[in-house]
Amino acid sequence: MKINNQQRTGFGYFLYGIQLALSPEIRRFVVLPLLANIILVGGAIFYLFSHLNMWIEGWIGQLPEFLSWLTYILWPLLALTILATFSYFFSTLANFIAAPFNGLLAEKVEETLTGKKINDDGFTAVLKDVPRVLAREWRKLLYILPKAIGLFLLLLIPALGQTVGPVLWFIFTAWMLAIQYCDYPFDNHKIPFNDMRYKLKQKQGKAYGFGVLVSVFTTIPILNLIVMPVAICGATAMWVAEFKHQR
């Protein structure tokens, strides 16, 4: 595989992640994150599609009569919001379960891109590092949950929740997904969570661009099953090109 560590747009890093995930050097490290994502996200999407129409009809039914003309606009918007929410929630759960293997995937991608070893201790070191890695995932959840709860409450407000809420939720999801996946290469170098967020904010355009494309892919059936390893590969490419030299 031809290595290219040039700087890209946020979209570009995600698309490069597809190329990296399919490369011979990386493929075997993709398997476990991929399986975790298929089992959890696949099951969630199957359940979602069997209930989606009922939920949306009930939600739109809360609109005041004078806003009933918005139904045709809100139906697809609410469908995308629910899809993104479900996919994000179960992707987060899959990421939590597969966190040690996600970190290993990010490590191998970085080694492929830079030609330099990050850790020489092997798989035993990965197992020993599990408690610290899970603590980091918990730290991410503590950052995300208050904001997610606030936005969820906004969605329950008639009219406002059905119009402004989905847009704000999509923006929020894009940022959270950027944090979720970019954190793996940062964490491999033991960079504190708050420092990682600060560095991403310095390149917010690229972080949001990356998160938006990840968010879109999580709403597309079948494609959402491969998002996790692809996003990790793309986020690691972003780390190498944009942030590694800042350490």
UniProtKB/Swiss-Prot annotation:
GO biological process, one term: cysteine biosynthetic process
MF GO annotations: high-affinity sulfate:proton symporter activity
Job description of the protein: High affinity, high specificity proton-dependent sulfate transporter, which mediates sulfate uptake. Provides the sulfur source for the cysteine synthesis pathway.
GO cellular component, one term: plasma membrane
Alphabetic keyword roster: Amino-acid biosynthesis, Cell inner membrane, Cell membrane, Cysteine biosynthesis, Membrane, Sulfate transport, Transmembrane, Transmembrane helix, Transport
Topology versus the membrane: Multi-pass membrane protein
Species for this entry: Vibrio parahaemolyticus serotype O3:K6 (strain RIMD 2210633)
Domain of life of the organism encoding this protein: Bacteria
PANTHER family, per database record: SULFATE TRANSPORTER CYSZ
Residue spans crossing the bilayer: 29-49, 66-86, 141-160, 164-186, 212-232
Stored Pfam families: EI24
Localization annotation: Cell inner membrane
Protein name (Swiss-Prot/TrEMBL): Sulfate transporter CysZ
Stored InterPro entries: CysZ_sulfate_transptr, Sulfate_CysZ
Family, per entry: Belongs to the CysZ family.
UniProt main location, coarse: membrane
